[in-house]
Amino acid sequence: PQAQAETKELRIAQQFGIGYLPFIVAKERRLIEGEAVRAGLPAPQVEWITLSGAAAMNEALIAGSLDIASAGIAPMILTWDKTRGTADIIGVAALGSMPNVLTSNNPAVKSLRDFTDKDRIALPSVKVGFQPIVLQMAAEQTFGQYDKLDNLTVSLPHPDATAQLLSGQSEITAHFTAPPFIQQQLASGKAHAVLNSYDVLGGPHTFNAAYSTKRFVEANPKTIAVLVAALDAANAWITANPAEAAKLYIAAEKSKLDPAFVEAIIRDPQVRFTTAPERATVFSAFLFKIGLIKRNPASWTELFQAGLWTKAGS
Amino acid sequence: MADATLAAPAATAPAAAPADQASRLRFNGWRKVVLLLGLALLWEGYARHLGNALLLPTFSATVRALVEGFASGELLARTATSLELLLMGYGAGLVLAALLTALASLSRWGAELLELLTAMLNPLPAVALLPVALLWFGIGAPSLVFVITHAVLWPVALSSYAGFRSVPRTLRMTGRNLGLSAPRFIIEILMPAALPQILAGLRLGWAFAWRTLIAAELVFGVSARSGGIGWFIYTNRAQLETANVFAGLLTIILVGLIVEALLFRGAARATIQRWGQEQ
Amino acid sequence: MADATLAAPAATAPAAAPADQASRLRFNGWRKVVLLLGLALLWEGYARHLGNALLLPTFSATVRALVEGFASGELLARTATSLELLLMGYGAGLVLAALLTALASLSRWGAELLELLTAMLNPLPAVALLPVALLWFGIGAPSLVFVITHAVLWPVALSSYAGFRSVPRTLRMTGRNLGLSAPRFIIEILMPAALPQILAGLRLGWAFAWRTLIAAELVFGVSARSGGIGWFIYTNRAQLETANVFAGLLTIILVGLIVEALLFRGAARATIQRWGQEQ
Amino acid sequence: MGVTLRVAEPDPLLSLDGVTLRYGSGASAVTAVQDITVDLAVGDRLVLLGPSGCGKSSLLRAVGGFQPVDGGRIHLRGKPVGKPGPDRMAVFQEFDQLLPWRTVLGNVRYALQRGRGLDRATAGKRARDWIGRVGLTRVLDAYPHTLSGGMKQRVAIARAFALEPDLLLMDEPFAALDALTRRQMQDELLALCEQTGASVLFVTHGIDEAIRVGTHVLSLSPHPGRMKALIPVPLAARQRGTTAFAQLEASLQADLLGEADQDTAPPSGERRHG
Amino acid sequence: MGVTLRVAEPDPLLSLDGVTLRYGSGASAVTAVQDITVDLAVGDRLVLLGPSGCGKSSLLRAVGGFQPVDGGRIHLRGKPVGKPGPDRMAVFQEFDQLLPWRTVLGNVRYALQRGRGLDRATAGKRARDWIGRVGLTRVLDAYPHTLSGGMKQRVAIARAFALEPDLLLMDEPFAALDALTRRQMQDELLALCEQTGASVLFVTHGIDEAIRVGTHVLSLSPHPGRMKALIPVPLAARQRGTTAFAQLEASLQADLLGEADQDTAPPSGERRHG
Ligand SMILES: Nc1ncnc2c1ncn2[C@@H]1O[C@H](COP(=O)(O)OP(=O)(O)OP(=O)(O)O)[C@@H](O)[C@H]1O
Ligand SMILES: Nc1ncnc2c1ncn2[C@@H]1O[C@H](COP(=O)(O)OP(=O)(O)OP(=O)(O)O)[C@@H](O)[C@H]1O
Ligand SMILES: [Mg+2]
Ligand SMILES: [Mg+2]
């Protein structure tokens, strides 16, 4: 009887990139539907939507046009803080841990200290996105001043920044980016890594996370459980079948990338597909410190829904 | 003297022009082709000189991508999806523009409202409408249609209203003399009289509908299934398939040229040029 | 009969209108204020009814955010930055539009080129220009100016050219009769004669410059230091400071209203209304 | 010749009572006509005669309902004149009074459909008939911009005649026509009036035309137009060549030419020749 | 009256040689005038007289350089007529020939500055003078849309006169003027011609005006306009009231009224009245 009260349709939004591979696998292999049936629930009608940027995600979620949003962990924490007492968003699951890398085509730049006024660092979003926050964390560690590099940053989407960086004909000399752009840039030989986000955070950290409103999570606990189970299943499958996962990704995204290249990214030991959040509190602590959030969560469990608490998160 | 007059600036060409309209039309086509070839060559040359396919593919590479895109059927499907949204938004925009402009020409309050709304809302980017669009229409196509409507409504309304306001007094008096009802006065007098401006507004609205559609497709959410040409551009851009990105843009250009040639030029030739409202 | 005529639709109001122009102007202002108040109330009411400040803040909350934004100086600085870019792009767009339209009215080739370029480039979104803009102008302000120019150029050129083409034959003959040089013919005959359409184009260009600026500030590499009002909107949007987002939008609306009231209305009143080209 | 005030008609079709028309307001106000009082019975044809700029067109527009009055009252069949309507069809002075997007036939037919509520076929038939009467059958399907000035005016005349209004407002309708065509048009006008009992308000600069067309002539003073004389045209004077005609013509001519327009005539100091 | 071909002038200012003007092409082509051959010596004033739609305005536009010829040649001082220029100032038939964005003074002054290259002050002085001569000093600073039809035409006349062109092209310039003003304008025209030796090509529908203004009258057949007669106006006939005048008038009248326009006149079957 309770199952009938739960939602019959599930609207899930993702963004571009290989970071959303668990979603893509769940979609293509119809894992959510499968898990629902296994749990004895009617298979929900799943609608997969692509949106660009956390802001559009948030607005859609708050407007009730979406059930599950996804974005970088830092913007998610920010949204969690901002919506406390109103929309009350809450993490549903992490979408895996993978490093972001600051690359540069300027041979002189070996570390953050080597940037000069002539350098420009491209970031995919402004101020409060995932990469800008990590860059600020790194600047804080290096210079003791988190906004030291802000004046060098410009906002430019990943693909454009990559094209600019590789062209060598532009002011863009550095780019804080994510897979597969990291690997593409490094493989071209025209850029080298300057900084790895794992080093900044002190180890593997969640990159993207799925989140929803508390209201939805509380009204649909079984559906949420099914979703997490489906993501777990997707992660297990990816880990077990990296080659097939690469092929599936390429087919689903109509990607022109080389399957071996994608497979290499999936196999990268730094990349971990797991629903358990990693080092979420490192982000929240930093955000609290620089005043972007007003409440410092005591534990990652404050950020994520109860169904996840059994996982080994951090 | 014929020579002398032909040597005069085209803008000041005598009204006798219709004389050789038929031959002129052929001539025009020829010039257009020459210009198009020139632009294509320029593109090709510059892209080769640049030698950076990631930033700017050559024209030939773009055409190749275009042909492949159409051969695979994807580009055609995407274009169809976009056109469908576009037409819905365009249609809704035109209807609203017609209503607002009619209201504006019927009452002082309507006029003030139109002027106010145009001045206020026209400069707002599509992103400003997102919250309201999401609230009212949810994610996806209906919201897209909504922002396209916003993009079309104001240029068309503004141009039409400006056109209405510059209808000569004698023509207005002629219409009023027949005791026309307000809707008839608007539809049968003001609209044809302001047709040059309305057509300019329709052209602009069309262009802005495209611009907005492409820019909005991602912000407003699409699923791979329902994505249009904006989706095509974005996904290819995300994969650094620059030739495909430009193939998508070229498709927009081609659609623009076709619509211009068949629809707008045709409409102008069948109306304002035939009626002597345009030289 | 005065009553009867006043009861007639405003669109068909007799040309005797200037009769009480002075009193009318006051009257207009009054209506505008009423309408503005009505719109503000509507906003406030709907937002309260909705009760979702994250999505749509109330009008009063937005005004509070606006006042704070200006008090802190940030909003003013951002607006100034945006306006500077806007004016540069607008200016460049106008100059190019003037050149293209002049060319188009001087030669058949120019006319074909203008028509072709408008049909081709006008529908292209600003993103399409990104690679070329970055190539030519690099990151930041110059590229923004470039895309604003693109946004302004086509509507202004298209409107002006449509205006040029509908200048009545007798007026053209009058100008040619004086043996005017081509530039003089364009500047002293065609331009004032087409002023109603040119003004409509300027209004549209202004609006599209804003839209494009805001939309492009995110994609086109602005840094925190140099960001304008688009930057303000985006950063606040990313932080769900919705009241600030709407304060930014309200600023655009206010600037739009001021420019409309002072510049465009003023220009229209001093020219086409005074000259009887507009009712 | 003094101002001959018209004896008030018992049941006038049109009555103007102290009509004053102004343009602009305040210090820059221009008075077009002042204090015009005249009645028109059914079947009357009143010709307005007066120097350029004395307000004839303005007065016609006011009667047509296109322009508000600033003083006095205009009554049509006892009721204040309201919005314009096809019961007062106007032929304007300007050449741009045809709808450019309709052919010659289309212009007249459209007016009949809308102004008289006729169906398309009936309207078309009647339109053809009238277009034939103004001698434009050849250009039935031509658009207005391909017509000569006089041809345009004739289409407007056909349109106004075809609607058979109670009151025709004609502002120098035949000014652009040659003598022969003009005479034919005058004949058509008189025949139409006879047939339908229409009244006419007619502006012309031709004294012979005034006598030929009018039952009364209202001569106006130079700007701002005031009533100078209201002269009935005796039946006998209508035939050109009669002495009555010659007398009336001479008297009107003296009236118009004699009193030089102090405002519009060049001050003697400014004139160098002739 | 047969076609009196003009004896070729030895050194004509303007010579038309078999001029044919057409509109449109192919089957839908309309011939406006056909085979017009006439010379104009310096100081000649040629009046075009002909029924509405016979191509008078078209011919004027062709001479002005506004319209290409489709047959024959037009020479001005021995050279093929080229682009329009202020040496051939035109007064068009339409009322919308003033620049709406310039005042009455501004319109005339601007024409003088551009057409004659005068500086602003000189042009202004001369403009005021001519505006005074057409009786419009009162509206010096008015914009064209506030003028009456006749006033607009007078501004255009003042503009054309002020430029003192070699050849004046006047298309029914006085049609909208009352008798007195018209006579004054005619006087101004004649005085100007006397003073500057200007030649004139003049379109009118008034026979008396033709005689008063012209040194020669070219009468055209109905559409398409062909030369019907080229009649010199004897000096003796120029004075109204003389028998020479009466004779010429009667002969022209017979010429124009007698031969009914088969094309533009209503076919007798179509006419019900008159
Ligand atoms: N733009 C045009 N296109 C086609 N036909 C035209 C055009 N202008 C004039 N015509 C035709 O050419 C003929 C002559 O016209 P034009 O204006 O020269 O006559 P007109 O002698 O000046 O007549 P009116 O005395 O009525 O002014 C007419 O039959 C007219 O229909
Ligand atoms: N829209 C207007 N605004 C201001 N003044 C105007 C307007 N229309 C006409 N006038 C003025 O009113 C007066 C009368 O104009 P109107 O057109 O009625 O004269 P008219 O008798 O018809 O002259 P005409 O014989 O030259 O056509 C003129 O002095 C004119 O300047
Ligand atoms: Mg008048
Ligand atoms: Mg003519």
Language-model regions, residue ranges each:
Chain D
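Conserved ABC ATPase signature
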Residues: 143-147, 151
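Catalytic Walker B motif of ABC-type/P-loop ATPase nucleotide-binding domains
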Residues: 168-171
